[in-house]
Each structure stands twice: as structure tokens, then as C-alpha cells.
Amino acid sequence: MHSLQRKVLRTICPDQKGLIARITNICYKHELNIVQNNEFVDHRTGRFFMRTELEGIFNDSTLLADLDSALPEGSVRELNPAGRRRIVILVTKEAHCLGDLLMKANYGGLDVEIAAVIGNHDTLRSLVERFDIPFELVSHEGLSRNEHDQKMADAIDAYQPDYVVLAKYMRVLTPEFVARFPNKIINIHHSFLPAFIGARPYHQAYERGVKIIGATAHYVNDNLDEGPIIMQDVIHVDHTYTAEDMMRAGRDVEKNVLSRALYKVLAQRVFVYGNRTIIL
């Protein structure tokens, strides 16, 4: 006897009348229970987005074939198991985002398997190994950007992750690296860019007397820090904050935004369309 499974059906297609009925009727025909359903129409682009969480006994190929026959031309649909996803985290030296992900993965807050942590420095090895997670050093010393990214990508591929998370990984990725993991790389950065670029952004912000600081989590594409945005947040600061105070506050925002973004991504709620995201 087959046991019940839970899967997530994600659909992007040109908007038409009756799409929800078509999709849900096919699910009913396959004797699948709809646990949750969310949809959105982008009237500017004429696109329909739908996330449907299903439970039942699946015949994937038949279900997808039936959907293809019912959906308009130019539709994209995917059906994946619900539940735990597998990630590899890339790091350099900063511990705040990594530590937060390790704690939440182990003690609640993120249903995720951290397959490995890979760093271009060895600084965070002891932290990672406390959680019995493999740490790999792939040093950039003596290597070109392309050579180092090739080694990093090969190391990541060995773990077959669903996503690659940059937890304050301070290297600019080559287009070749990004192309190996399309819409699979998630980055966190402070929201000062491009106003405060380069080193010591919090010190630059302090000198300018900023009143808010924040962070942005986004997918990585070929343009530095310009990929589709998943999550953003800010906090208010004032004249009493030193540069060090701003840095501490900024790190708190960064780790919170990254974990919240990752939660949405792992739940298969984030749709990428062009350079935007739709979160259902």
C-alpha cells in the first residue's frame, strides 16, 4: 500500500480566466488533497503565479502531463517534495549569520539540512565543527578568481545542495560560478549599497549621520548585489550610536533578514520572474 506524500506544485503562466479551476480540478481528478493554495496575478506582465501544497499518492508524470494539456502555451510548472531542503553555506571570517543559521537548523526555526560549510579562510572551522557539520577550506591564495571559483563550485557539487547560501562570504563570484547554480545562490548584504560601497560601510554611515540601517537578502546573478530581492528590513538609529553600535545593530538585521529569506525559499514560496520575486 502506498503511503501519502506531500508535494508543492508551482505554476507560472500567462493569465487567463479559469486557471485556478483547471489546476484544482486536475488535482481532484488525481485524488490529491489541497492542503494550501496561494495565487497572484501580475497585471503589469499578465502573468499568473500559483503555489499549491498537495497531499496524496502521486503519479508525477501523469499529473504534469494533464497540467500541460490544460495550461496555456508558455507555462512553467514544477512539482517537488515538500519538507526539508539541503544547503551548503559559504563563509569568510564573519560569524554572526553563520552562527544564527547553525543554531536555527539545530534547535528550531529552520527545517534545513546543512550539508557542509565551505570557507576561503579557516577562521570559522571550530564553530562549524561544534555542530558536527563538515567544514572545508578552499583557500583563494595563489589562485585567480576563475580558478578559485572552479574549486569552490566543485566542492559544492560534491554535496548536491538545493541552495547555496552566502553567509557574509566576501568574494565576488564569477559569471561562470553563478551559471552553475541559477537561482540557487542566496546572499545577504547591508542595504547601504550603493551609497556606501567598499570597506567599512558602517563607519561611512556613521560619518554621514544616517538614521536607518538595514539589510537585503537576494538571489545572486551576474551583476554585483543586483539579483532579485527576497527580503529586506531596517532599524532606526540616532546620533547616540557609534560606528561600532551601528555595526552590532547591522549584524542583527543581517542575520534576521537572511534566516527569514531562507525560510521562505526553503518552503518553496519564492518565485523568480525577471529580476523580481513573488512570495506566496
From Swiss-Prot:
Keywords: Hydrolase, One-carbon metabolism, Purine biosynthesis
Keyword Hydrolase in annotation: yes
Catalytic activity reported: (6R)-10-formyltetrahydrofolate + H2O = (6S)-5,6,7,8-tetrahydrofolate + formate + H(+)
Pathway of action: Purine metabolism; IMP biosynthesis via de novo pathway; formate from 10-formyl-5,6,7,8-tetrahydrofolate: step 1/1
ACT domain location: 8-86
One Gene Ontology MF term: formyltetrahydrofolate deformylase activity
PROSITE patterns named among the record's database cross-references: ACT (PS51671)
Signal peptide: none
Gene Ontology biological-process entries: 'de novo' IMP biosynthetic process; one-carbon metabolic process
CDD domains on file: ACT_F4HF-DF (cd04875), FMT_core_Formyl-FH4-Hydrolase_C (cd08648)
InterPro entries, sorted: ACT-like_dom_sf, ACT_dom, Formyl-FH4-Hydrolase_C, Formyl_transf_N, Formyl_transf_N_sf, PurU, PurU_ACT
Protein name, UniProt field: Formyltetrahydrofolate deformylase
A Pfam short name: ACT
Enzyme active site: D225
Homology family: Belongs to the PurU family.
Job of this protein: Catalyzes the hydrolysis of 10-formyltetrahydrofolate (formyl-FH4) to formate and tetrahydrofolate (FH4).
EC number: 3.5.1.10
